[in-house]
Design a protein with these regions (language model features):
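Active-site environment of divalent metal-dependent phosphoester hydrolases
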Residues: 147-148, 276-279
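Bacterial N-terminal signal peptides that target proteins for export
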Residues: 4-16
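Aspartyl protease catalytic domain
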Residues: 112-263, 267
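Zymogen propeptides
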Residues: 28-162
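Active-site neighborhood of phospho(di)ester-bond hydrolases with catalytic His/Asp-centered motifs
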Residues: 269-272
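C-terminal regions of proteins
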Residues: 278-321
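Bacterial N-terminal signal peptides
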Residues: 17-26
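Short beta-strand scaffold segments in enzyme catalytic cores
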Residues: 97-101, 168-172, 234-238, 279-283, ...
Length: 321
């Protein structure tokens, strides 16, 4: 019995020593290198388990997130994110405000106005509604009135005004990608087409402004209020990385608008509408109820309803893919 008692006491002392050593090792008390593996853990033969926690899956909003315009300047800075990635940037050069869109994250949608082109079998009508509204990032004006002879208009296989060869054309394909070029001169490709909006000739081609931007202002680039050369103007371009660039200004000549686009990286561009009543762009902040609109162009007059209510003229929306 005494031998058994002594054995039990020795066993208890050995256990206490092991526990104490383990505690010291956990506190770094065994003199091992900082952050290193404790020698005791290796001796005990237990599996070394790294303190690893799986990161929780990140959940992104189901709508584009607008970060605000910030201070406008020549450097591009993010204004819209989609699923945590930058989908739109903003910059301003020589008074020309530009929005640049990543077509991998967003797509362009051509809307028919209630008067221009008017009622018809259009998939996208005179206001942004339903699921499109929930995915809305931006919207802006389209081109001249269709009765001015500036070009054709087509959507969903239906033609409001016949397309004209050589006209600057904003072509959106059914896969959601958009290209800009002269009709039947490089575009369209063989892909199925969703919509085409034509307006005048290319303002920018191969990164160079049209030769007429200084010499043929009203005849080539549209009649202005009071025959002024410097008025509100807008355009849509595309850069070498297939990003779309909307450009607008409350006061510019065609040459100034073209140069702003070129400085922003545009390779090709079509002029859109001009004069202050018809040049407008918005970003949209999502919350409860109707999206809140954020005017993009300093000094813009804006349009009634901000494209969230029926509008008479056609326009473009930028929506999350």
């Amino acid at each position: 019995m005494r031998a058994d008692g002594r054995a039990r006491r020795k066993g208890r002392r050995a256990g206490l020593i092991v526990l104490a050593a383990t505690a010291l090792a956990g506190c770094g008390g065994l003199g091992g290198p900082a952050g290193g593996t404790s020698p005791l853990r290796t001796v005990t033969g237990g599996p070394a388990r790294a303190a690893h926690r799986s990161r929780p899956k990140r959940h992104y909003p189901s709508f584009p997130v607008v970060n605000g315009l910030g201070t406008l300047g020549p450097r591009w800075h993010p204004v819209v994110t989609v699923r945590g990635q930058t989908a739109a940037w903003i910059a301003q050069r020589d008074g020309v405000t530009m929005l640049r869109f990543d077509q991998r994250l967003v797509r362009l949608v051509l809307h028919a106005g209630s008067a221009d082109p008017g009622s018809g079998p259009w998939q996208y009508g005179d206001t942004i509604r339903g699921s499109e509204r929930r995915r809305l990032a931006a919207a802006f004006n389209a081109g001249f009135k269709l009765d001015t002879g500036a070009g054709g208009w087509q959507s969903g296989g239906h033609v409001a005004v016949p397309l004209t060869a050589g006209r600057a054309s904003i072509v959106t394909y059914r896969d959601g990608t958009t290209d800009i070029g002269a009709w039947q001169h490089g575009i369209p490709t063989s892909q199925p087409i969703a919509s085409v909006r034509q307006n005048l000739s290319l303002l920018v081609d191969n990164g160079v402004a049209a030769a007429t931007v200084n010499s043929c202002i009203e005849t080539c680039w549209g009649a202005t209020i009071g025959n002024a050369a410097t008025v509100a103007r807008s355009a849509l371009g595309i850069d070498a990385n297939r990003r779309l660039i909307y450009a607008a200004t409350p006061s510019a000549t065609p040459a100034t608008l073209a140069q702003g686009l070129i400085d922003g990286g545009a390779q090709r561009a079509a002029e859109l509408d001009i004069n202050p009543d018809w040049v407008a762009a918005y970003l949209y902040h999502h919350g409860r109820g109707l999206p809140e609109f954020l005017p993009v162009i300093p000094g813009q007059y804006g349009v009634a309803g901000h494209f969230l209510a029926p509008y008479t003229r056609d326009f473009f929306a930028i929506v999350e893919r």
